[in-house]
Every structure is written in structure tokens, then in C-alpha cells.
Amino acid sequence: MNLNRRSLLKLSAASVAVGSIGLPSFAQQIEELVIAYNVNLPSWDPTVGPSAVNPTIQGLYQSVFDQYILQQPDLSPAPGLLTEWGWSEDKKQVWMTVREGVTWHDGSPFTAEDVAWSLARVAKPETGSPIQFVWGTLANHRVEGKKVIADVAQFDPTIFKWMYFLTGYVLPKVYYEKVGAEGFE
């Protein structure tokens, strides 16, 4: 058989057409979502251990957990779980207003208590947060309505920037206390 250019093009077009005809799918249906990722996830707690500061894993964590403050593509902050934040005039306290109408995975409401607890938890050295030294600059976290107030133990002008960077995630207090750290492994 001698193929000229025109015959080769016709044969190629016919092959593409035959290949595009719908064939039955042999894939099995499953009851779970499977995501392939190029690194292992050692923990589902995005605030502790080496994985908390691994930039490769942050995409996974951001798919599951919300951060205090969001970061826009131009790197500017935007409201996230916190709608407003700032400093007292004397810079001895920070305040944060918590978004309303948010629920956790189990349907329970997201509260200012979750924010205060999450910030206080990662400030403790025993939690294993790799950047505990940042969160430890705030102390005496308390809730006043939908606001969280914290005292500034050591002034860090970048504290709000950390809330949209590594380990800047809020965890559900009630759920965490129910399942413990083991529930996030």
C-alpha cells in the first residue's frame, strides 16, 4: 500500500473521528473524593508540626480550613473569617470582628470563641506550632459579643499578616475538644 499525503490526512481524520465516538465507561463509581497530591499529608491540623509551614501543603489546608484573613492575588488582605481587625490607639490590644453566618463541617456555628481559642492554643509551646513565637505575642484572648480582644504581650506590627499566611487557620473548638489532637491525625 502506497500512502500519499492526502490519503494520510484522510486516514488521520478518520482515526480521530472513530476515537471520539462515545464508548461505555468502565470506571467504577466510588463514595469518596480521591485527590492525588505530590506530598504526603502527615496531619490534618494545619497549625502544628513541620507540615504547617510546608508551602506545598498549604493548598490542601486551604481547601479544608478557612483562614482568619484572606489574601488577594495582589497580596493585599481581605475579609475572611474576620471581617474587621485592628489595633487599639495605644497598640496594647488588638481587636477582631468575627464573620456571622458561618458553620463548621458538622453544622455547628462558627463563633468568636473559636477564634479566641485557636489563637490562644497555637500560642502555647506545647502545641508544637512551628511559629508559636508569632502567636505568643498576643495574650489574654477574650470574647466580647462577636469581637475577640487580645492583649499585646510583645508588639509585632505584622501580626495580622500572619493571619493570612502559614498556620493562620481557625479550628473548631468544640469539635477539637471532642476528638482531641488524635482526631486530626
Identify the role of each PLM range:
Residues 1-15:
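N-terminal secretory signal peptides and thylakoid transit peptides that target proteins
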Residues 22-40:
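C-terminal segment of N-terminal export signals and the immediately downstream linker at the start
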Residues 36-89, 120:
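N-terminal lobe/hinge region of extracytoplasmic solute-binding protein
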Residues 40-43, 101-103, 155-158:
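Solvent-exposed loop/turn segments at secondary-structure junctions
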Residues 63, 80, 110, 114-117, ...:
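Extracytoplasmic/secreted proteins, especially bacterial periplasmic and envelope-associated proteins
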Residues 84-128, 144, 149:
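Aromatic- and charge-enriched surface segment that lines or borders ligand/interaction sites
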Residues 132-185:
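Surface-exposed binding/hinge segments that line
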